[in-house]
């Protein structure tokens, strides 16, 4: 018999606003949203929410690592262990993300990562793989030796090696071969993200026609232009991406990658246009500094709220999803409902899972977090209606 739970004395954060109502969970799904004074049969377990928020579980679609693991190292149990830890920072679903991999080992690596995902049975849902690269025009912190040109054979290699788990690919769509590469991936419903690109802004609508539907870390590794000789603002790639309504913009909301005022600017777009992603690396979530090798010869340090190389180049982030939530709420000055759309619903939509997760709504999976109303800290995390993390402080 399925467990029946009634969460009362809570404020539900839904896409339409904050609602002082009860949440009914039956088994692993949300059964109903109910007025507080409505009566039910007595077989429902009553849970007092202590006047806290119920917020949808967060979905991180760009995550290179967390705590002791970098997914680019393909260590055994990397996703198994992190799936158990991520609910502590509000994550109920994530895409372990890969950097630009050596061409000769890409297939073996993706196979190994896919096999590890198969073993992840507890904690946050491992929703698939995000291949950040290898088709970049601008390497950023990635190994430039591993950059490759897009092609149909490469698309098929990524699809086969990931064993059906590929959910998103980031590329620079101005590269030769991109159109056919993108269209091949779209046949398998892969989300295509523009990133590490120096594309001509005029071409953005064409890229959307091909199937580009999102941007990886908006404003980062996307060069802009100075004013021309007459003082006129020159259309930059980021301007064109803002203007293209078919593309959702991924945002690393740590106050370092994107200035808070730019975060506020993006928050004025329609709510389906912005989503939060961490781009976190090994050491994110750690209370002490962590040093690791991103690729042979490229050492990175995670400390003081950022991840960087020895010469100061940003190399992902140390951001956690709960910090991203808190920062977006602070920087955007928007409602908690709009924050939830960016943290949960739009990421789910980007990877085609918004019909079953991403918001507090009837018939969706009961993946949610209890947020303290005073400080927006996590009190408890639920996945499939079961408590998987409790804040003991």
Where is each model-derived feature located?
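His/Asp/Glu-enriched, well-ordered alpha-helical/loop segment
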Residues: 233-249, 267-278, 284-364, 368-371
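Metal-associated gating/positioning segment near the N- to mid-region
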Residues: 50-108
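Conserved, mostly hydrophobic/aromatic
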Residues: 131, 185, 215, 328, ...
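Divalent-metal coordination cores built from histidine and acidic residues
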Residues: 83-165
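N-terminal metal-binding scaffold of metallo-dependent hydrolase/deaminase domains
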Residues: 1-41, 382
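Active-site metal-binding motif and surrounding structural segment of the metallo-beta-lactamase
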Residues: 37-55
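Active-site core of metal-dependent hydrolases
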Residues: 156, 160-287
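C-terminal cap of metal-dependent C-N hydrolases
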Residues: 10, 349, 359-393
């Amino acid at each position: 018999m399925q467990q029946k739970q009634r969460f009362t004395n809570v404020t539900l954060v839904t896409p339409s606003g904050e609602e002082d109502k009860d949440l009914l969970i039956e088994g692993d799904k949300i059964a109903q949203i109910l007025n507080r004074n409505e009566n039910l049969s007595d077989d429902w377990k009553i849970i007092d929410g202590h006047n806290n928020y119920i917020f949808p579980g967060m979905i991180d679609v760009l995550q290179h690592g967390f705590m002791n693991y970098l997914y680019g190292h393909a260590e055994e149990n990397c996703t198994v262990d992190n799936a158990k830890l991520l609910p502590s920072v509000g994550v109920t679903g994530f895409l372990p993300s890969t950097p630009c991999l050596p061409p000769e080992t890409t297939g073996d690596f993706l196979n190994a990562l896919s096999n590890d995902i198969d073993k992840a049975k507890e904690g946050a849902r491992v929703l698939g793989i995000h291949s950040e690269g290898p088709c970049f025009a601008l390497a950023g912190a990635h190994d430039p030796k591993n950059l490759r040109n897009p092609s149909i054979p490469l698309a098929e290699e990524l699809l086969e090696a990931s064993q059906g788990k590929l959910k998103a690919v980031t590329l620079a769509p101005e590269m030769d071969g991109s159109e056919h590469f993108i269209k091949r991936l779209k046949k398998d419903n892969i989300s295509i993200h523009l990133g590490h690109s120096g594309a001509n802004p005029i071409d953005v609508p064409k890229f959307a026609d091909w199937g580009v539907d999102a941007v990886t870390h908006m404003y980062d590794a996307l060069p802009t232009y100075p004013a021309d000789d007459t003082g006129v603002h020159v259309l930059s790639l980021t301007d064109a991406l803002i203007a293209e309504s078919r593309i959702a913009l991924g945002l690393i909301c740590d106050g370092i990658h994107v200035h808070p005022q730019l975060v506020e600017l993006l928050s004025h777009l329609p709510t389906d246009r912005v989503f939060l992603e961490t781009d976190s690396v090994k050491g994110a979530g750690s209370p002490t500094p962590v040093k690791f090798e991103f690729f042979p010869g490229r050492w990175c340090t995670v400390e003081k709220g950022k991840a960087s190389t020895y010469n100061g180049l940003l190399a992902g982030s140390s951001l956690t999803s709960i910090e991203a939530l808190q920062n977006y709420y602070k920087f955007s000055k928007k409602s908690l409902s709009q924050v939830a759309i960016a943290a949960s619903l739009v990421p789910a939509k980007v990877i085609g899972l918004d019909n079953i997760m991403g918001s507090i709504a009837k018939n969706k999976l009961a993946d949610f977090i209890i947020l303290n109303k005073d400080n927006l800290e996590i009190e408890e995390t639920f996945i499939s209606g079961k408590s998987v993390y409790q804040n003991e402080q």
